[in-house]
Design a protein with these regions (language model features):
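Acidic, mature catalytic/reactive cores of soluble proteins
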Residues: 1-172
Length: 172
């Protein structure tokens, strides 16, 4: 979005901040990162009325403790947009992005809390599966452009097809 708004410096700074913040949990990504990249702030409930009397009023966000599979597609899509806009991805960054794609191959079949941050039992969400497909598709695009190593590209291609089949037969 920042690139499309004509803010390439801010887009680059955000991309590198995200890669830096996620370094400690690599290849896993957290749902939320504080601005300083530190540990999440716990969620707490306040004894106040919210908008139009709604309750509970929460400070913080418990989603930080959830699994949301869509975040991997967001990151790899961002990396591809950055690279296509002329951003340089060094070898180490390419290896890290490939590691994220490898992780997606291992975890996409799991249920998650989805972008809706469901607070109960994790479920299979179409959006989450689609974003796992996006993650692997964008990893393949980055691979084809020489930005990430191709060592596991055949696995990514196989899993892209498996995710598509899952979406077409089990999702709605």
């Amino acid at each position: 979005a920042l690139l499309r708004l004509g803010c390439p410096g801010e887009a680059e700074a955000f991309f590198w901040w995200l890669l830096h913040a996620s370094q400690l949990t690599h290849p896993r990504l957290q749902v939320l990162y504080r601005l300083d990249g530190g540990e999440r702030a716990p969620e707490r409930t306040l004894e106040l009325d919210g908008y139009r009397g709604s309750r509970p009023v929460r400070v913080g966000n418990e989603a930080a403790a959830q699994t949301q599979l869509d975040i991997y597609g967001d990151l790899l899509q961002t990396a591809l947009i950055y690279a296509e806009a002329g951003g340089r991805l060094d070898r180490e960054t390419g290896r890290r992005l490939a590691g994220i794609a490898d992780l997606v191959c291992r975890i996409w079949r799991r249920p998650d809390s989805g972008i809706w941050e469901v607070r109960g039992q994790p479920l299979h969400f179409t959006h989450s599966k689609m974003m796992c497909w996006v993650a692997l598709d964008r990893a393949l695009c980055l691979c084809d452009a020489g930005h990430v190593p191709s060592r596991h590209a055949s696995t990514w291609r196989r899993e892209v097809l498996a995710i598509r089949e899952f979406i077409e037969t089990r999702c709605w």
